[in-house]
Amino acid sequence: MAAYVSPCLTPPDSRVLTVLRKSVLPDHHLGTRVGCLRMSEGTTKRYRVVASHKYESSSIRNSLNSHSTSHFQSQDSFLNLHPEISMLNPRKETSSVPITEDLDELSTPNTYNEARIKVIGVGGGGSNAVNRMIESEMIGVEFWIVNTDIQAMRISPVFPDNRLQIGKELTRGLGAGGNPEIGMNAATESKEAIQEALYGSDMVFVTAGMGGGTGTGGAPIIAGVAKAMGILTVGIVTTPFSFEGRRRALQAQEGIAALRDNVDTLIVIPNDKLLAAVSQSTPVTEAFNLADDILRQGVRGISDIITIPGLVNVDFADVRAIMANAGSSLMGIGTATGKTRARDAALNAIQSPLLDIGIERATGIVWNITGGSDLTLFEVNAAAEVIYDLVDPTANLIFGAVVDPSYSGQISITLIATGFKRQEEGEGRPLQATQADASMGATRRPSSSFTEGSSIEIPEFLKKKGRSRYPRL
């Protein structure tokens, strides 16, 4: 387990540790130094605080403004006025049990300044994706499902208070029957309840499987409410498989067009592209599960960048700067092991099923590399070389790095490409890959002239132009 120990400050007469979820940080108005330990145990456990000193339980409960005789008070009036002096002296303890408190027990959402992220699964497809996120033990986000089908909602692992039935009068809990207009009217009927569910959010993911009734019609309404409230709103949706029929495909395109006008950033994942990653004998149910899992990866790729403390942190303000009013965006997630794992992970991210076309036209890129304690500067450099060699030199780039002991032996890279909105408007059409573009995007690979000992300075990477690209490996 990796640990990072940093000096923190705490009021000399309070003996209170201030705990934040993302890391252990000091109260900024304080005076005496104590040791604060930050530990990462992967994405399934929160950070914990372990006090290296042993205290009497009564001393922890002492109030900041308490005037009663405390463990640190003395017969000396000077020491009573200045208890920090006596705190510096060693003393005997009545308890030998170290204080180990779980962050979930010590913290509440109002005790620290942290971006509040909500994932709203709309309709059957969106709800299934949220269910899968919960099963994968995602942390740092709040899950909601919104549906017209009350029966489907009852079997979800989402907390009952976070299940929002819309259109009670219109549908009577029986669903939208695959009609997007009913889904839209149901969401409109329940706008006040939607606003209450979104209240207090800094960022909202609206996820759905497009082509049906509730998700296709309701997602644009829900996203519009969120954006009108000033919340950073990201839509991440799938398009139907070809075998689902032409009607659902057409409904999906109409729903996507409506959603695009009501979000800051829209990521569309074509389900048909996932078929290339599975065998011909794959059952239909497994194909849909794969689509749900891609939605999960997309949401987690962004939320992890914000919620997991990093070696080089990418905070919410960074992500907002890239994704606010960005229009159509692309995302890639790549993981690799072995001697060339950094370069391979970067290539896998660029060629991810989440990427509909290449990232060369993006005006904003945020990418994050996660590795174990064995992650080296050489590997960070190699991954950066692949990415910066491909993107536009004028693009706004934000980079983050996270060391997570659970990633020992492997590297994962998440890449978000934004800023296609300007090109869309200039060309008078939405960002979509042609058949040729999609084929090229699936096979091309950027070159890398990385050599051992070269600098990790970003400007050096951005100067590299005009080289031969996309050689087949």
Curated annotation (Swiss-Prot):
Coiled coil: none annotated. One of its GO terms (biological process) is chloroplast organization. Phosphorylation at Thr-282 is required for the formation of contractile ring at the chloroplast midpoint. The lineage of its organism: Eukaryota, Viridiplantae, Streptophyta, Embryophyta, Tracheophyta. GTP binds at G124, G125, G126, S127, N128, G213, T214, G215, E244, R248, D292. It comes from Arabidopsis thaliana. Residues 424-455 are annotated as: Disordered. Belongs to the FtsZ family. This is Cell division protein FtsZ homolog 2-2, chloroplastic. The gene is FTSZ2-2. Residues 445-454 have a biased composition (Polar residues). Disruption phenotype: Slightly reduced number of large chloroplasts due to impaired plastid division. Stronger effects on pastid division in the shoot apex, where the proplastid-to-chloroplast transition takes place, than in mature leaves. Increased plastid volume in the shoot apical meristem (SAM), including the central zone as well as peripheral zone of L1, the outermost layer, and the peripheral zone of L3. It is found in: Plastid, Chloroplast stroma; Plastid, Chloroplast thylakoid membrane. The keyword Cell membrane does not apply. Aggregates to form a contractile ring-like structure; contraction of the ring was accompanied by an increase in the filament turnover rate. Self-interacts and binds to FTSZ1 in heteropolymers to form two morphologically distinct types of filaments, termed type-I (smooth filaments) and -II (rough filaments), in a GTP-dependent manner. Part of a complex made of ARC3, ARC6, FTSZ1 and FTSZ2. Interacts (via C-terminus) with ARC6. Interacts with CDP1/PARC6. Binds to PGK1.
